[in-house]
């Protein structure tokens, strides 16, 4: 089992445990165990669909006898009235899986919709939009899947798959040179093939990084577009570049036109509205 599927399965199991507990007594009390039925996933708001594959896993994990017919795949732009899928099976199973499936699909579709909006804003540039670790605890893998579905790029998944030397790391380490050198030594000692990114707060710090080298990407933290253009010129293509901090949808393209490779946007995952949809008997 790969790590991604393992995390998703654990999330599904936890979600069912917190929702159903010792039983869905409403459903169990009024719906016969033998009753069969169908429900459709009805889209009620325009956006980008995401989470269909996870929904299929939710149904299968709860009741493998449920049959799912998909009409619209992940990444497709949808509109009110669209039917994304129809699920057939025991009515008890349909009712007990409804809320978890909707919670996941609404959240993922909201993120994919927001990401698509940002990605379209960057069309015609060489800049890609990145997500961050500002995610819902326990749901990061799903939220980062949604970013990719929407056309964005995943930054690191967690603290384990990339070294990102931020301001606090630099300050506690005693400076940029010490932070970078210790990171390189650590990777060598541990046999870790990890990319190293460092955050800079001003041109002095940027010059220190350029003089020392040893990194893969440089993040410009809270730079204005004018500062960003100068910083990109200083880097001169030697390292990947990323803009972060204080960037809004309205200023996104201003930063992209400075020539940065990536722009990281926490809003893709930390303050997204779910896409409206419902699961109705049919």
Language-model segments: residues:
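Glycine-rich beta-strand-to-loop/alpha-helix junction loops that act as flexible
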Residues: 220-221, 241-247, 265-267
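Acidic/glycine-rich phosphate/pyrophosphate-binding loops and surrounding catalytic core
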Residues: 1-212, 217, 226-234, 239-240, ...
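Active-site glycine- and acidic-residue-rich loops that bind
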Residues: 138-140, 245-248
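Active-site loop ensemble at the mouth of alpha/beta enzyme cores that anchors a bound cofactor
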Residues: 278-282
């Amino acid at each position: 089992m790969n790590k991604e599927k393992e995390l998703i399965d654990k999330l599904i199991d936890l979600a069912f445990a917190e929702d159903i507990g010792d039983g869905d007594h409403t459903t169990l009390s009024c719906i016969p165990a033998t009753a069969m039925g169908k429900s459709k996933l009805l889209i009620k708001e325009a956006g980008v669909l995401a989470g269909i594959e996870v929904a299929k896993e939710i149904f299968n994990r709860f009741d493998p006898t449920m049959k799912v017919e998909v009409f619209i795949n992940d990444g497709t732009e949808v509109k009110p009235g669209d039917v994304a899928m129809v699920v057939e099976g025991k009515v008890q199973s349909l009712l007990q899986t409804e809320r978890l499936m909707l919670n996941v699909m609404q959240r993922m579709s909201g993120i994919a919709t927001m990401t698509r909006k940002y990605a379209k804003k960057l069309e015609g540039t060489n800049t890609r939009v990145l997500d961050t670790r500002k995610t819902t605890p326990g749901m990061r893998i799903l939220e980062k899947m949604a970013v990719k579905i929407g056309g964005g790029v995943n930054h690191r998944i967690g603290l384990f798959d990339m070294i990102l030397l931020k301001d606090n790391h630099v300050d506690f380490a005693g400076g940029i040179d010490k932070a970078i050198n210790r990171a390189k030594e650590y990777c060598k000692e541990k046999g870790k093939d990890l990319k190293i990114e460092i955050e800079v707060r001003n041109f002095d710090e940027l010059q220190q990084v350029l003089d020392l080298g040893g990194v893969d990407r440089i993040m410009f933290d809270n730079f204005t577009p004018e500062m960003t253009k100068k910083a990109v010129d200083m880097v001169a293509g030697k390292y990947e570049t990323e803009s972060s901090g204080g960037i809004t949808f309205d200023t996104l393209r201003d930063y992209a036109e400075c020539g940065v490779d990536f722009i990281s946007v926490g809003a893709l995952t930390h303050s997204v509205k779910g896409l409206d949809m419902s699961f109705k008997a049919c």
